[in-house]
Amino acid sequence: MTSLINADTRIKVSSVLNRDTTNYGKQNLIDGQVETCWNSEQGLPQNILLDFPSAVSVSSIVFQFQGGFVGKKCVVVGSTVDAPNDYSIAIDTFYPQDINPTQTFEFDATPALKRVKIIFEESTDFYGRITVYKLDVLGQ
């Protein structure tokens, strides 16, 4: 499995803490730096949307959360090239642990997808904030 995220992958997030995109923006999800992160505003649900330059088959998602600010219920959905705004392809639902180390969530390889949306329906934070230091999507 290889990383599907590259310079041409567009990423959108539902919110950024205090609109401070420099310190907490989406670019920090994939910059490889251990001290930078994406931090959402309070409120649920939150989401991360990945728009790939071409169709991909996803087989796992890698996260590193900040303990205490973990998306404790994550729903992953996808859309095809023919209908990029129709997120009707259910990929998986997983429940990350409230810990700091990297966690990998594997599932059956998906059909060819144009976009993948990760929805955080619940958070370990009372206010619904999510903090992610690392995100990777693996597959073909």
Regions found by a protein language model. Name each.
Residues 70-84:
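Short, surface-exposed beta-strand/strand-loop-strand elements in extracellular ectodomains
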Residues 65, 78-80, 139:
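Residue-level signal for short segments within beta-strands and strand-turn junctions
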Residues 54-55, 70:
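Short coil-to-beta-strand transition motifs
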Residues 86-108:
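Extracellular carbohydrate recognition and processing domains
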Residues 39-41, 67, 96-98, 109, ...:
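Sterically constrained small-residue positions within well-ordered secondary structures
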Residues 1-53, 66:
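Disordered, acidic Ser/Thr/Pro-rich linker "stalks" and the adjacent N-terminal cap
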Residues 1-2, 133, 140:
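Activation corresponds to long, low-complexity, non-globular regions
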